[in-house]
Regions:
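Extracytoplasmic gate region of multi-pass secondary transporters
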Residues: 26-28, 254-313, 353, 380-384, ...
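Primarily marks hydrophobic transmembrane alpha-helices of the MFS/SLC 12-helix fold
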Residues: 76, 128, 335-338
Length: 476
């Protein structure tokens, strides 16, 4: 039997890695390189990250339908092509700002004061908003296309594991980002960091064009592998298989409780991942005076996502082990696994207290919150892989990309609320020196957000379980 399905997973993994590398460039360059040049504060950055989240959310709704309409191969090509253009557009934001305000260099922008500095901050922020919008529009297609490709190439029992592997690309992207992006920005300028990382997407497109095809048409898939891929179809009649493959309307997708359960899971938890992805570098700088361009900063971020990568892949394997051992249906096994994963983010509650308690360690005290955050993030990725797989468990194949898009929109909205709220809270906390649970200033703001992140998964699981308490396949 051929094993081309794992080559497909490798390509999905590579695309997701590039996806997250492109997103990470801003979070790893704004505080040290972009902020001084454009006179930004946390509110400006919070506006940009929240806009990305909401535009990504809106785009997800249409990206799912677009992938269903175009098909997996063409839909993915368009998606990564657009987001690669968006990634490269960030590099011209500085030039655009210089042209608008009539200054000739980055040094002149950074040296500006008064009203001119305010104009620079505003114009540059809007330039980045445009670039982030194009990036979000393209990146919205990644998960609908990847989940659809997984459903095309894997039987139900293997989908969570396959999803956990390509979903680990998010962690790998975040893992290599601090090792590559800050040095690129430091030695070649932050603009080149955006350009070089953006070009990777165009390289991936060349492989996808020549390698991917529907498994029935693929010259790389033999009869034995095709039978393995389509083993679930033997459980249905020929007429039922035809209905499963039919495209399902957007309105019809909204009528399924299974859709709303997925929406609830995404809304409650996606923002947690984005918060740690976007704000951890800034948190380390604010709390411990550690910059991502220095050795300790790179080591901390690298370790965080190394732990996430290793642990999250095993999280995708857990439902398969439960199914094989107990004979539970896929949905029940996933929900049991997700409940286990939902308890691990509670460790994030200890990040701030322990980080402050061991302050005698100096900047090395940062290792404590980083390790706790990494465990919470690993639990998120394991949770996410299983959450995505619930779609294929209960919904027809013709609805998978659409429902993935709907859930992605919900996750983006939840993320936008958390990112914007966090940015405003941190700015307010710093300005007013607010106190909360023994913390003062920005540390108080971080502790509030950490509390929200810690409980999000248990709340999300409870809502999902109440909407779909038992395994029920949608019939058309």
């Amino acid at each position: 039997m051929t094993n081309f399905r794992w080559t497909v997973v490798a390509m999905l993994f590579a695309a997701t890695t590039v996806n997250y590398l492109d997103r990470q460039v801003l979070s790893l360059t704004w505080d040290e390189f972009i902020k001084p040049e454009f006179h930004w504060n946390e509110s400006h950055y919070g506006t940009i990250t929240s806009f990305f989240s909401i535009f990504y959310a809106i785009s997800m709704l249409f990206a799912g339908r677009f992938v269903e309409w175009m098909g997996t191969k063409k839909g993915y090509l368009w998606s990564i092509g657009v987001w690669s253009v968006g990634a490269c557009l960030h590099a011209v934001c500085g030039v655009a700002t210089e042209a608008y305000v009539g200054l000739g260099s980055a040094a002149e922008l950074a040296a500006a004061t008064g009203d001119v500095a305010v104009v620079i901050a505003t114009v540059s922020m809007w330039s980045f908003l445009v670039a982030r919008g194009v990036l979000a529009l393209g990146e919205a297609g990644n998960f609908p296309a990847a989940i659809k490709a997984t459903a095309e190439y894997f039987p139900k029992k293997d989908r969570a594991y396959a999803t956990s592997i390509f979903n680990a690309g998010a962690s790998i992207g975040a893992l290599f980002a601090p090792l590559t992006i800050p040095p690129l920005a430091k030695y070649f300028g932050w603009e080149m960091a955006f350009l070089i990382i953006g070009v990777l997407g165009f390289i991936w497109m060349g492989f996808w064009v020549f390698l991917y095809d529907d498994p029935k048409k693929s010259k790389h898939v033999n009869k034995a592998e095709l039978e393995y891929i389509e083993q679930d179809k033997h459980e249905l009649t020929e007429e039922e298989n035809k209905k499963v493959a039919e495209k399902v309307s957007l309105n019809k997708c909204f009528s399924f409780k299974q859709t709303w359960a997925f929406v609830a899971g995404k809304f409650m938890t996606d923002g947690v991942w984005w918060f740690f992805l976007f704000w951890t570098p800034s948190y380390l700088n604010t709390q411990f005076n550690i910059k991502t361009s220095e050795g300790l900063g790179m080591a901390l971020i690298f370790t965080l996502y190394l732990i996430v990568t290793v642990l999250s892949i095993y999280g995708g394997k857990l439902p398969t082990l439960i199914i094989n051992k107990s004979g539970l249906n896929p949905y029940a096994a996933r929900m049991r696994s997700m409940l286990i994963f939902a308890f691990f983010p509670l460790l994030v509650l200890l990040a701030q207290p322990l980080g402050m308690h061991f302050d005698y360690l100096g900047r090395n005290a940062a290792w404590i919150p980083v390790i706790l955050i990494s465990i919470g993030c690993a639990a998120h990725q394991a949770w996410s892989a299983n959450l995505f797989s619930t779609i294929g468990d209960m919904l027809p194949q013709g609805a998978i990309a659409t429902v993935t898009g709907i859930g992605g929109m919900a996750g983006g909205i939840g993320s936008m609320l958390l990112q914007k709220g966090a940015g405003n809270l941190f700015h307010y906390a710093g300005e007013t020196n607010m106190t909360f649970m023994g913390f003062e200033g920005k540390p108080a703001g971080y502790f509030i957000i950490f509390c929200i992140c810690a409980f999000a998964y248990l709340i999300g699981w409870a809502i999902m379980k109440s909407l779909v308490p038992k395994y029920k396949v949608v019939t058309l």
